[in-house]
Amino acid sequence: MAEINLKRFVDIDIQSKVTRAISGTRNIVVLYTPEGTSGTTNIISSLTEAESTYSSSKYPETIKYLKTYFNNGGVKCNVIEGKSSKDISVDDIKALPNEYIIVGCVKDTNDEIDAVYSNLKTLAITLSTDSSVYGINEKILVARTVTNSDETAVKNFAVKYSNEVGAEMTIAAYLSQINVYKQDTVKDYSFTQETISAENLSDADFGTVLDNNMNVDITLVDAVRNTGGNLKDGSELTNAFVKIVLHQTLTEKLTQLLVQKIKNSSGLSQIYSIIAQELEFYKSAGYITLDKVWNSSDLDVSYNGETYTVIQQGTALINGYVIKVLPISSLTEADKSAHKAPPIYVVVADQYGIRQITINGEVI
């Protein structure tokens, strides 16, 4: 006897809800090049793909940058053709998707390296003063120079002092390998072994490069290694990069939470929990450290006419972070009508790398 399919009458299909996975790595690197066709973009994933797409005969400069990038472990690179450094506008940079954090530009054969450096530096300065650029949409621009005398402090501007074309792509390659969801992947860029030529500098010139917050490769412990590790404003490169990624992953996690239609105090507990869980990943990755104390004055914030203390002077960040969620009572009726959550403040103790060891002692 033939069986009748019961789905004709009652069709049930219960599935587990699958939350979209959030990646701990980003497709972070954009490389503009004056070579090629304006408007053409290619996401390149390997040196083999780079060499087949950008042959040295047609793209003699672009391939140099890509070789340096992939020879130093770069993960992916989005190449945007037909734009030189002088053609890139602030709007071009701001229009890039948030995941693209690192931006470089190929030197035109007719350009002086100082001109390219100056153009990218101007872009970085302009971006740093743009109030619409913060948190998840910040970019770090990478450039190369052969002049060590620039003392200007510039936010989110990473500089490699080198005579080798494309050497700044070692910075991009290093950052592209960081995975904030894996253990101990966030480390100081200084002393990283790299596959480029070492610079032959006097001790005085080397000191000037570091004093001006540039990066330079030298031979150290029988290998070519980057020294420096800072952005042009003196902030640590790795920490600045991971802070941007933290903004992005936290935003993604909290957005996923919002679509679940959370409400009231239980919703605030969920928000707190999501933030804490995310920060624990960053602690495991090495970005957050446990040995810092808030030595500044009390951090007070004002909201709707009331003052709240986020963290007091002398507080040890024993977990590596402090999360302060203002109470429901801080909300006005207008806030409640707009379905706002109270403001949330996060204080994070980021790691720092030890770059110099000084030992003082006496022989007795």
Which stretches of residues belong to each language-model region?
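Structured, hydrophobic secondary-structure cores that serve as assembly/anchoring elements
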Residues: M1-S55, A223-I364
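General structural signal for secondary-structure boundaries
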Residues: S45-E51, E61, S85, T109-E112, ...
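Alpha-helix capping and helix-coil boundary motifs
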Residues: S84-S89, D150-A153, S202, N304-T309
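Short small/polar-residue motifs
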Residues: K139, D203-A204, D211, G320-V322
